[in-house]
Curated annotation (Swiss-Prot):
This is Partner of Y14 and mago. Residues 138-147 have a biased composition (Polar residues). GO terms for biological process: exon-exon junction complex disassembly; nuclear-transcribed mRNA catabolic process, nonsense-mediated decay; positive regulation of translation. Residues 82-116, 145-204 form a coiled coil. PANTHER family: PARTNER OF Y14 AND MAGO, PYM PROTEIN. It comes from the Eukaryota.
Amino acid sequence: MEAAGSPAATETGKYIASTQRPDGTWRKQRRVKEGYVPQEEVPVYENKYVKFFKSKPELPPGLSPEATAPVTPSRPEGGEPGLSKTAKRNLKRKEKRRQQQEKGEAEALSRTLDKVSLEETAQLPSAPQGSRAAPTAASDQPDSAATTEKAKKIKNLKKKLRQVEELQQRIQAGEVSQPSKEQLEKLARRRALEEELEDLELGL
């Protein structure tokens, strides 16, 4: 069945070419006015409520469609009507991949549970006093390393601020008449450097 044709221009005006009906009969060629739009091409009006409900997701946020979709038994060969061999192969491949993924997730969950149970066994109160004290000493090390890192950052920021202040004094004194792009960027970052320095000093 051919779709309704768009208006075509001729010497005598516009016309819609003849089209075939679903029952096999033909519609006659019709002349139309300038600017005529066929009924099939007129967009359907939708108010804002209809648009809102169409765009609204069917599932709650965070819930994947796979979790709610019912598991359908795989059809036998040739049981899927209207599908080509390639489409059937793709379906089989997807089904196999899904089964492998589910199996992998189950194995990962089992390994995680085993690991948790082993950790709980290792943390029983029967452990000697010395072995309990060891993790505490180890946990102090990251804190001291973080403090050292902050101190280095503070020193670095103070150095950068000192350079910015010196540059500003040189510009005000007339030593630098035309500051370069990099020098102007340094001056612009002064406030950001000061704020970062304050945050680090408060965090110590």
